[in-house]
Amino acid sequence: MSKDIATPGRTTEILKKYGFLFKKSLGQNFLIDSNILTRITDTAEITKETNVIEIGPGIGALTEQLAKTANEVVAFEIDQRLLPILDDTLSAYSNVQVVHGDVLKADVEEVVAEQFAKPELPLKIVANLPYYVTTPIILKLLHDNIPADSMTFMLQKEVADRISAVPSTKSYGSLTIAIQFYMEAELAFIVPKTVFMPQPNVDSAVIHLKRRKEPLAEVNDEEFFFEVTRASFAQRRKTLWNNLASKFPALKPRKDELVEGLNAIGIDLIRRGETLDIPEFAKLSNFLGDFLKEK
């Protein structure tokens, strides 16, 4: 039998050995196709001069592939039941450390400084993310300013479509903007549901996020910028005016003045949020921020 973890036979053997039962609440689906693992590490551009943070190693299938190609790997695992399994399956790799904990509550920057022997090496984040925590984890990693050159995630295809979307498409929304503001997003390849154990209900995709040197647009207040983008998509079929007036009631008595000012910078409030690109949202939020401060 192959020693690689990512095969149906080896995965079944490991699970039986430890009497492991999947927890639906943790969205556990383990990869059983080593070709997919190779494609993930190729997409992430992992080399021996790269440190890697992995989130959710499971029984270690992707971790094993990362250990073979990276300098060091630090893996966050929330499920304590998996720790003895990982000790076993990864025992041959001295360049892997497993941290028991929830990455959403962790000080990842501190972990990087303390756990890697050479923290100065380029850092990449790689993960097979369960659907229920995909967005919170990605946004935490972005907003905590983790010094990662890139992030490569396997996630539900629908979410990958939203992250990599372009304006005027049904997948484009506030999540697209929240991520593409900081990162270039590429949907690398589709992963069929048949390569997981247990098999999920939907296909997955691998998305590669590469950090921009500067955010995609200049904004006066990032927090307000994201507040405006979220408000603009609150009800997708409504116009910018309807959504923004609902979020910021102080705009209502000054509609004519607002319309005139936004028309002057090329933004029509009868448009829907999905038609604006990120630089246009930056112009909109910068104008609105100043407008709302006026007496």
Swiss-Prot record:
One of its GO terms (cellular component) is cytosol. Its EC number is 2.1.1.182. Keywords: Cytoplasm, Methyltransferase, RNA-binding, rRNA processing, S-adenosyl-L-methionine, Transferase. The keyword Mitochondrion does not apply. It is found in: Cytoplasm. InterPro entries: KsgA/Erm (IPR001737), rRNA_Ade_diMease-like_C (IPR023165), rRNA_Ade_Mease_Trfase_CS (IPR020596), rRNA_Ade_methylase_Trfase_N (IPR020598), rRNA_adenine_dimethylase (IPR011530), SAM-dependent_MTases_sf (IPR029063). GO terms for molecular function: 16S rRNA (adenine(1518)-N(6)/adenine(1519)-N(6))-dimethyltransferase activity; RNA binding. Coiled coil: none annotated. S-adenosyl-L-methionine binds at residues 29, 31, 56, 77, 102, 128. Specifically dimethylates two adjacent adenosines (A1518 and A1519) in the loop of a conserved hairpin near the 3'-end of 16S rRNA in the 30S particle. May play a critical role in biogenesis of 30S subunits. Belongs to the class I-like SAM-binding methyltransferase superfamily. rRNA adenine N(6)-methyltransferase family. RsmA subfamily. PANTHER family: DIMETHYLADENOSINE TRANSFERASE, DIMETHYLADENOSINE TRANSFERASE-RELATED. This is Ribosomal RNA small subunit methyltransferase A. It comes from Listeria monocytogenes serotype 4a (strain HCC23). The lineage of its organism: Bacteria, Bacillati, Bacillota, Bacilli, Bacillales. The gene is rsmA.
